[in-house]
Amino acid sequence: MDKILGKVPMGEKIGYSLGDAAANLVFQMMMIYQLKFYTDVFGLEGAIAGTVLLIARIVDAFVDPAAGILSDKTQTKWGKFRPWVIWTALPFMVFYVLAFYNPGIENKALVAVYAGISYVLLMSLYSFNNTPYSSLGGVMTGDMKERTSITSIRFVAATVAQFVVQGLTLPLVHKFGRGSGADDAQGWLSTITIFAVVGFVFLVVAGFSAKERIALSLIHISEPTRQE
């Protein structure tokens, strides 16, 4: 019981928080720049690009619960949730890059198909990584003050990543691009690759740093009214 309710080392909290920083390097990019990338780089019409994003959101509504169910049923010596954070880190970041990669297809219908498939797979991997990651924070300790501390540090990491994406994306695109405009495909690819490498390292650190100290059954018994 002392282990369950004990303090979580600061290094573990910071390591875990890097997972949210990684997620926001992806999430903020999708929210702010994905549509712009589709129209400026892929050359898709706004309505088509918007439809691609809408379809992905609909698919994601089914993927999220599936990710939660599968991670909850996982049983390994590392726990339920840590393995998913580590297992999905590489494919998650690979499809992050592919979602902002211009394959050089001239047929706009095929471009739309590529955009749809790559974005749906990216969103799916986001769910299979971030859903277990979020659940992991709830099993690191049974101490509510410690959970609040973990959440606070995680929020700071996410906010920093948000500012990085908002403040550095276009300058990096211009720096690495072969041309001078924000529509340069090489600039986008180089920028996203940098973010993806950083995100991969952060997720691996988060997965290996955090420790699952309590079982979900204990959470449900001790906190019957707790809402996620």
Where do the language-model regions lie?
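Membrane-embedded alpha-helical bundles of multi-pass transporters/translocases
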Residues: D2-L218, S222, R226
